[in-house]
Amino acid sequence: MRGKVGTAVTAVVAVLLGAFVTADAASVRVRCETRGDRSKISVDGNDLAPGSYTATLKSPASAASGVTAPAKTAVGDEVEFDFDSNANDVAAGATQISQSFIQGNTVRGEIVGGGVSVSGTATCRVKN
């Protein structure tokens, strides 16, 4: 009888450990757009643990410093950050950046919190 119980416990532990190993890793998607008079960037995190997160942008992607958005709480497993130079979008909750924030047509976004740090780089779409 002990052998059967030990085998059952081992099987349950193996299944639980397998669930942790196969869980989706946190990811980030960075999108950006630039116009002559506007910079617009979104940094979206997915497969995140519950918690509070911040997002930091750098442009060009290799810049030493950047702009950090106020902390947000993940909803489900997602958190979204918007950065914009348009006053209406800033009034609607986007973090303000300058019209000329995007340099070299690239940005790097990083989401930090909940014990993770994920980052990504994007080449910006140019609109006239």
Can you describe what each PLM-predicted range is?
Residues M1-V9:
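Bacterial N-terminal signal peptides that target proteins for export
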Residues T10-G18:
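Bacterial N-terminal signal peptides
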Residues A26-T68:
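Short, surface-exposed binding/anchoring microloops in extracellular/periplasmic proteins
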Residues A55, Q96-V116:
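Short, aromatic- and glycine-rich surface loops/edge beta-strands on solvent-exposed regions
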Residues S62-N86, A122-C124:
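Solvent-exposed serine/threonine-rich low-complexity stretches and specific carbohydrate-binding patches
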Residues D77-Q103:
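Short, solvent-exposed, Trp/other aromatic-anchored flexible loops in extracytoplasmic proteins
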